[in-house]
Design a protein with these regions (language model features):
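Short acidic, low-complexity intrinsically disordered linear motifs used
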Residues: 1-10
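ATP-binding glycine-rich phosphate-binding loop
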Residues: 11-56
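ATP-binding glycine-rich loop module of kinase domains
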Residues: 39, 43-89
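Active-site beta-strand termini and strand-to-loop segments that position acidic
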Residues: 51-55, 111, 205
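Protein kinase-like catalytic core scaffold
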Residues: 59, 90, 107, 192, ...
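Conserved structural core of kinase catalytic domains
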Residues: 88-175
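Protein kinase catalytic-loop region centered on the HRD/HxD motif
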Residues: 182-192
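Catalytic activation segment of kinase domains across protein kinase-like and atypical kinase folds
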Residues: 192-228
Length: 228
C-alpha cells in the first residue's frame, strides 16, 4: 500500500516550530533550523535532503535552499500528489508536504537507498541507461533521430554479453516492464526523460528501483539555463 493512500495530514516532528519554516524566513535561516534538528542525507544546488522519523521509521525531508528549490518542490509535488501518478510503483511514495505556505518550502517522502549506475542498470535489467531511455521513447512514440527502433533495440540488448551481463528472455521482459512504467509516468507528466539517465535520481525502495527526484520538468528547465 502506498503511504499517500491512508495519510491525509502528517505534521513535521512535534517539537519543530512551523513558523521557522515559513516564507517570511530567509532560505538560509530555514535550512539552518531544519539541519539543526535533522541528519543531512545529501543535496544539490537547489535542495537539501535530510532524514526525520515518522512512526518509528526514517523518512526523507527535502527543504528548498533557493527559488529553484521551491520550483522543484512544486514540480515534484504535482506528480507525487496526483491521484494516479502518485501511486505508480516506479516513484517514491509521498508522505506529506508544506501546505502552510504559498510555495512549498519542504516535502516529505519515504526514504530510498542510494544506488550507483551498475546497480541501477542491474535492477532495471538493462545494459545501459541510454538503451533504457531509448526504449521508453519508443513506447511513447517519441523517437529521436538516431534512436534504435524496437527490432534494432532488442538485437542490441542481446548483443551485449559478458561476465557481468548475460541477458535472458526474462531480463528482456523485466526491462520492458520497467520501461512501460516510466513511459506511463513521463507521458502523463512534465518530467524530463533524459534526466532519468542520472543514477542520482534513483534509489531502491521495497527492493525495487524508484525515481526519487522528480523536480526536473519542462516547467523548471528555466532554472537550469535551458533555452526554448
Amino acid at each position: 500500500m502506498r503511504a499517500k493512500e491512508f495519510i491525509n495530514e502528517v505534521p513535521l516532528p512535534p517539537d519543530w516550530d512551523p513558523e521557522k519554516l515559513n516564507l517570511r524566513q530567509t532560505f538560509k535561516d530555514r535550512l539552518k533550523y531544519a539541519l539543526d534538528r535533522a541528519k543531512r542525507l545529501g543535496g544539490g544546488s537547489s535542495r537539501v535532503a535530510m532524514t526525520i522519523d515518522y512512526e518509528g521509521r526514517p523518512t526523507a525531508l527535502k527543504v528548498a535552499k533557493n527559488a529553484k528549490g521551491l520550483a522543484q518542490n512544486e514540480a515534484e509535488i504535482e506528480i507525487l500528489d496526483d491521484g494516479y501518478l502518485g501511486n505508480l510503483p516506479i516513484i517514491i511514495p509521498l508522505i506529506d508536504y508544506d501546505k502552510a505556505n504559498k510555495r512549498p518550502v519542504w516535502l516529505q517522502t519515504e526514504i530510498a537507498k542510494k544506488i550507483q549506475a551498475p546497480t541501477l542498470m542491474k535492477l532495471l535489467h538493462t545494459p545501459s541507461l541510454s538503451l533504457f531511455t531509448n526504449k521508453v521513447r519508443n513506447i511513447m512514440g517519441q523517437q529521436k533521430r538516431f534512436d534504435a527502433n524496437d527490432e534494432q533495440l532488442k538485437a542490441e540488448y542481446f548483443k551485449t554479453s559478458n561476465d557481468r551481463w548475460k541477458p535472458t528472455e526474462q531480463d528482456w521482459g523485466m526491462f520492458n516492464e520497467y520501461a512501460n512504467e516510466v513511459a506511463d509516468l513521463v507521458s502523463q507528466s512534465k518530467l524530463e526523460l533524459d534526466d532519468l539517465r542520472n543514477p542520482a535520481n534513483w534509489g531502491v525502495y521495497n527492493n525495487r528501483p524508484v525515481i526519487i527526484d522528480l523536480g526536473f520538468t519542462s516547467d523548471t528547465k528555466q532554472y537550469y539555463g535551458y533555452m526554448g
